[in-house]
C-alpha cells in the first residue's frame, strides 16, 4: 500500500472500518477533540511558526482552526470531509472537500502557501508520504508544516500502525513520513508531556 515505506509491514495502513471515509464523516461533529490546554498549546505553536500576512493551509480541518485570533493572515485555506463543519469555520477564507485516502493530490498551485497544519488527524492517513509530498509541493521554499497529535482518535478509522505503536513512538513515525516526502529540518517536540492532568500533545515540524 505504501511503497515509500518498505520497512513497515504491508498491513500498516489498514483500518478496522473499511467503509468509505466520506460516509464516516457525513454527519457534522461540532466538538473539539483535545482539551483547552492542548488547544492553547496548538495555538501558541501556530503563533510562533506561521507568518502573519501569509497564506495558511489547514488540512483535515473542521469548524475550528486553532489559529491565534489576533493574527491576520492573507488567506486561510481549509480542507476537510464535511462541508457543514468547514462552512462554519470563521477563519477559512475558502475551503475544499477531498478524501485524501482516495486522492492525495491537492488542488493548489506549486509554492503557493507559507504554512500548513494537520491537527490531531494524521493518524487517519493511509498514504501519508504521498499527502506530505503534496504539502511540500504547495509550500513556498522554507515554508513550515506543523503536525500535532495527542492520544485520542477514532480507533476504527486510525491506521493499524498508529494504534499499535506506543504513544512516544508516533513522533518517530511522523518524522519518517516527513523525511520520505523530502522535508528538511524535521523537529519533533513534546509540547505537553503525558502523565499530566491535561491532554498530552506532540508536534513534528518540517520545512520545505
Residue ranges and their predicted role:
Residues 114-129:
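A short SAM/SAH-binding and catalytic strip from SAM-dependent methyltransferases
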Residues 2-51:
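Class I SAM-dependent methyltransferase Rossmann-like catalytic core
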Residues 41-44, 48-107:
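Class I SAM-dependent methyltransferase SAM/SAH-binding core
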Residues 41, 165-188:
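Short alpha-helix
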Residues 144-175:
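Conserved class I S-adenosyl-L-methionine
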Amino acid at each position: 500500500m505504501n511503497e515509500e515505506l518498505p520497512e513497515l509491514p504491508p498491513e500498516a495502513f489498514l483500518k478496522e472500518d473499511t467503509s468509505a471515509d466520506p460516509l464516516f464523516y457525513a454527519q457534522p461533529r461540532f466538538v473539539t477533540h483535545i482539551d483547552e490546554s492542548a488547544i492553547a498549546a496548538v495555538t501558541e505553536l501556530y503563533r510562533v511558526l506561521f507568518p502573519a500576512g501569509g497564506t495558511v493551509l489547514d488540512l483535515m480541518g473542521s469548524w475550528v482552526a486553532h489559529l491565534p485570533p489576533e493574527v491576520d493572515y492573507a488567506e486561510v485555506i481549509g480542507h476537510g470531509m464535511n462541508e457543514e463543519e468547514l462552512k462554519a469555520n470563521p477563519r477559512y477564507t475558502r475551503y475544499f472537500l477531498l478524501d485524501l485516502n482516495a486522492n492525495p493530490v491537492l488542488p493548489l498551485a506549486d509554492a503557493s502557501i507559507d504554512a500548513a497544519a494537520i491537527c490531531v488527524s494524521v493518524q487517519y492517513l493511509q498514504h501519508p508520504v504521498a499527502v506530505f509530498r503534496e504539502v511540500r509541493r504547495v509550500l513556498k521554499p522554507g515554508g513550515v508544516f506543523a503536525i500535532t497529535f495527542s492520544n485520542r482518535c477514532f480507533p476504527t478509522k486510525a491506521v493499524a500502525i498508529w494504534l499499535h505503536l506506543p504513544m512516544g513512538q508516533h513522533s518517530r513515525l511522523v518524522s519518517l513520513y516527513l523525511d520520505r516526502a523530502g522535508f528538511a529540518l524535521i523537529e519533533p517536540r513534546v509540547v505537553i508531556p503525558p502523565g499530566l492532568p491535561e491532554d498530552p500533545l506532540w508536534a513534528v515540524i518540517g520545512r520545505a
